[in-house]
């Protein structure tokens, strides 16, 4: 079944979720793969929100929250949420002045370039993923005990991500991608592996994975990589594990998309 949704529209996201909920479909895997890049000029969605912020984070936050009933439908089945972040999240910031509700339709001086904004949005993916997994483990949320949430860097892949950039930048990046990026056909390997690999599933959620080990299918590497505390995964940006940043992003995003906190 194919259901259309436009992440530049909160109404479209809500309609998409409504259709799935009405069909009583159980979702075993949710891969949040949508993303865009823009130029430095201000571009607003129909909701009056800066477009990149909405597509790359807010609509994915809204969709995930709305679909939780389909993910927690039965206690004897596990579900996995995979947030497609990026290694660029390491240079991102959770800037509370730039991303609060009063700065959604104006270019704030803290939002310097489109690349900084993109990096910020990819950090939000990692922060939200960890926040979500932490929520699933809290007392009283046993109905979500079978769900885990992880974030990943898919690698440098041939794609249309650059189409929102100024034409000269798009040409440059397309050329670079054609020379050194992974073929599009391989672009989903990291996402699918993170969602289905038995040994990764056994480690639960709240993790961040880079593409290198996953792409090489190296099981031993997956189980002894950089994050020695967990024994698996890669250590993400500090904000991804900061409860303070997690709570701020959750509360702010909930208010913007019109959802109450649990």
Question: Over which residues does each language-model region extend?
Answer:
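A generic structural signal for short coil/turn motifs at secondary-structure boundaries
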Residues: 39-40, 218, 236-239
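Rossmann-fold NAD(P)H-dependent dehydrogenase/reductase core
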Residues: 1-163, 259-260
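Short, flexible, mixed-charge acidic loops at enzyme active sites
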Residues: 94-103, 164-168, 218-230
């Amino acid at each position: 079944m194919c259901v259309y949704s436009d992440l530049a529209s909160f109404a479209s996201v809500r309609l998409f979720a409504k259709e799935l909920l009405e069909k009583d479909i159980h979702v075993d895997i949710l891969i949040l793969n949508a993303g865009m890049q823009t130029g430095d000029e201000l571009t607003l969605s129909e909701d009056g929100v800066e477009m990149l912020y909405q597509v790359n984070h807010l609509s994915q936050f809204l969709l995930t929250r709305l679909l939780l009933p389909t993910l927690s439908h039965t206690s004897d089945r596990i579900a996995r949420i995979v947030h497609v972040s990026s290694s660029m999240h390491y240079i991102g910031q959770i800037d509370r002045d730039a991303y609060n509700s009063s700065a959604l339709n104006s270019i704030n001086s803290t939002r310097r370039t489109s690349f900084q904004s993109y990096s910020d949005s990819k950090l939000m993916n990692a922060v939200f993923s960890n926040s979500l997994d932490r929520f699933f483990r809290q007392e009283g949320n046993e109905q979500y005990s079978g769900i885990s949430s992880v974030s990943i860097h898919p690698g440098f892949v041939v794609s249309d991500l650059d189409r929102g950039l100024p034409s000269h930048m798009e040409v440059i990046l397309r050329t670079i991608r054609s020379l050194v990026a992974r073929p599009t056909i391989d672009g989903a390997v990291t996402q699918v592996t993170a969602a289905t690999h038995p040994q990764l599933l056994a480690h639960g959620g709240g993790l961040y994975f880079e593409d290198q080990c996953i792409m090489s299918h190296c099981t031993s590497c997956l189980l002894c990589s950089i994050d020695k505390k967990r024994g698996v995964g890669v250590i993400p940006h500090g904000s991804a594990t900061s409860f303070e940043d997690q709570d701020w992003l959750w509360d702010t995003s909930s208010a913007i998309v019109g959802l109450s906190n649990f």
